[in-house]
């Protein structure tokens, strides 16, 4: 078999669970049409649970339609961009689907963004409307961006009566320094009320024709790992396809009978599509958390008999040692998934020893509408992030972007499927650079260095931009970090290459020690530890201790920030 056929023959298909299709049936629907169908099908089922407050699918549809009618009355129309600057709460779900109901584009903004970052996204996305948490309004005001309308909402609006004060105080603690605008300020600025739009308008939004294939649904912004964040263009078809792909790959659930923990932030594509949209598509109840309080999440898993739990590496690394983790019967859950970054093998092993349950890893990015690969439930492989989900094609290309790599060799992962973005918003050059042609079709270049083994499982090595060239050798930053994490006194680590005229790049390790080890372990001891476990050319030449490391929105160590800092930028 030639190299090209080794990938195009899809060797991973033999590992699909029985009954899983090579490609799923994708409904010819827009996202709001899907939500309306689900609401009619599961009318009396619980859709959202918010700190004890329950909202049925029927009631959720009514709220979505009322809010859509209210937005339309304020001038929001098809083609507009509506920004959501919200924490996880029922208002997020309502506003998200209401904007889509009108044919508008949604651009979710991270609640932890500074006013400068908010300004960039508002201007770049051409948003005219912002749905905003009241405690975040100051950041919108500071941007100075001219907006047609700002709708304010409070986290307490959908809290049970006994939780209202607690909710406000918890948020004040989490978002210290932020304050709610006074009634006078609201009136002076002409701000709209979320609840007023709900109560004043009937559930009769205007009829809008949406082309699922052509019309944009969401403009999610990438993390800005190279320059300013940019938006991936995701159509209604992309969104509908992804939920169909994911649900067909994990045929574990009973429609209308599942409960999913929804603490991953909805502004991020992982929480937005895998948790929120796919959860609702299954008729599940979503248990929402505004802030990721571990004790509350663990209690809710048992209280509501949760069946699905989606997390990120930092969460599992914390839970594997947390004293209250054993309060949950993890073996009862049907699905435990880790995404957004690779999980250290030591964490996987410690988790399995402690809980008796298995974490399934997956892979994806904003540009793939969250997911392209996942681990089959019956046959996960350690060290692998899984196999392509139904409808996906994957291959490994050489560094020059011309030829496919032989099976087992490392190169750049390229992808093709119905969930792949249409391109980057207002960046035609970036779009052209993001795709390569294979077999007469466009394939997405992920920028990730990956290999595929003989069985069709894929293995992650590093981001292409994080590959360090030292004395002519290629060094994967992640490989060095994996060794550092094996040290019992290292809590966190980030490795980058620092440009050097003589050797290409010097390898630098930023290290956070466990509190009891600080001041007792030297930089040279860390270097010596690495010498015992790494080839000579992979050993860091510089070690710098830190109290903490910069993180991305999903808790990854931000190598970009470390790299910029080390280069004096």
Predicted regions and their residues:
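Flexible, low-complexity linker/hinge segments
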Residues: 20-29, 169-216
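Conserved AMP-binding/adenylate-forming core of the ANL superfamily
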Residues: 25-27, 36, 44-89, 93-97, ...
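Structural core segment of the AMP-binding/adenylate-forming
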Residues: 73-74, 101-196
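Conserved adenylate-forming
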Residues: 74-76, 200-214, 219-262, 284
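AMP-binding/adenylate-forming catalytic core of the ANL superfamily
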Residues: 113, 130-134, 309, 417, ...
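Conserved AMP-binding/adenylation subdomain of ANL enzymes
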Residues: 240-259, 267-308, 321-322
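Gly/Ser/Thr-rich phosphate-binding loop
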Residues: 306-311, 320-381, 393, 402
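Conserved ATP/PPi-binding loop(s) of AMP-dependent carboxylate-activating enzymes
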Residues: 387-391, 402-435, 473-475
């Amino acid at each position: 078999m030639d190299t090209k056929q080794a990938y195009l023959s899809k060797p991973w298909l033999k590992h699909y669970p029985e009954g899983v299709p090579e490609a799923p049936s994708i409904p010819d629907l827009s996202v709001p049409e899907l939500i309306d169908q689900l609401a009619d099908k599961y009318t009396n089922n619980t859709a959202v649970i918010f700190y004890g407050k329950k909202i049925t699918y029927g009631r959720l549809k009514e709220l979505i339609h009322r809010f859509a009618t209210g937005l339309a009355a304020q001038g929001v129309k098809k083609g507009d961009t509506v920004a959501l600057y919200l924490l996880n709460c029922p208002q997020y779900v309502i506003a998200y689907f209401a904007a889509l109901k009108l044919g508008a584009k949604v651009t979710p903004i991270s609640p932890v963004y500074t006013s400068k970052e908010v300004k960039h996204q508002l201007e770049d996305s051409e948003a005219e409307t912002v749905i905003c948490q009241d405690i975040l309004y100051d950041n919108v005001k500071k941007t100075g961006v001219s907006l047609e309308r700002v709708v304010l909402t409070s986290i307490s609006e959908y809290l049970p009566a006994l939780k209202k004060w607690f909710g406000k105080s918890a948020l004040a603690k989490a978002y210290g320094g932020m304050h709610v605008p006074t009634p006078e300020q609201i009136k002076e600025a002409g701000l709209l009320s979320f609840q007023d739009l709900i109560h004043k308008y009937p559930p009769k939004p205007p009829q809008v024709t949406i082309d699922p294939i052509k019309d944009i649904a969401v403009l999610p912004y990438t993390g800005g790992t190279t320059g300013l964040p940019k938006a991936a263009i995701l159509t209604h078809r992309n969104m509908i396809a992804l939920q169909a792909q994911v649900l067909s790959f994990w045929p574990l659930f009973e429609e209308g009978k599942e409960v999913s923990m929804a603490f991953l932030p909805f502004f991020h594509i992982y929480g937005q599509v895998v948790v929120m949209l796919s959860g609702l598509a299954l008729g599940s109840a979503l248990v929402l958390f505004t802030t990721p309080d571990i004790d509350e999440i663990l209690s809710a898993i048992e209280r509501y008999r949760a069946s699905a739990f989606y997390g990120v590496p930092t969460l599992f690394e914390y839970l594997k040692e947390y004293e209250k983790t054993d309060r949950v019967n993890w073996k009862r859950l049907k699905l435990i998934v880790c995404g957004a970054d690779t999980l250290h093998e030591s964490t996987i092993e410690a988790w399995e020893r402690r809980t008796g349950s298995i974490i399934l890893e997956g892979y994806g990015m904003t540009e793939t509408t969250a997911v392209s690969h996942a681990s089959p439930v019956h046959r996960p492989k350690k060290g692998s992030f899984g196999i392509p989900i139904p409808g996906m094609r994957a291959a490994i290309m050489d560094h020059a972007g011309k030829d496919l790599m032989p099976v087992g060799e490392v190169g750049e992962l390229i992808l093709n499927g119905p969930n792949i973005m249409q391109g980057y918003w207002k960046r035609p050059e970036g779009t052209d650079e993001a795709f390569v042609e294979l077999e007469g079709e466009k394939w997405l270049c992920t920028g990730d260095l990956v290999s595929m083994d003989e069985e069709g499982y894929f293995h992650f090595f590093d981001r292409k931009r994080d590959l360090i060239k030292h004395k002519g050798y290629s060094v994967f930053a992640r490989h060095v970090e994996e060794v550092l994490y094996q040290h019992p006194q290292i809590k966190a680590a980030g490795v980058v290459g620092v440009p050097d005229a003589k050797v290409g790049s010097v390898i630098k390790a930023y290290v956070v020690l466990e509190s009891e080890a600080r001041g007792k372990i030297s930089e040279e001891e860390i270097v010596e530890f690495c010498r015992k476990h790494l080839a000579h050319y992979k050993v860091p030449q510089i070690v710098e201790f830190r109290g903490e490391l910069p993180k991305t929105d999903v808790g990854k160590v931000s190598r970009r920030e470390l790299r910029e800092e080390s280069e004096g930028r």
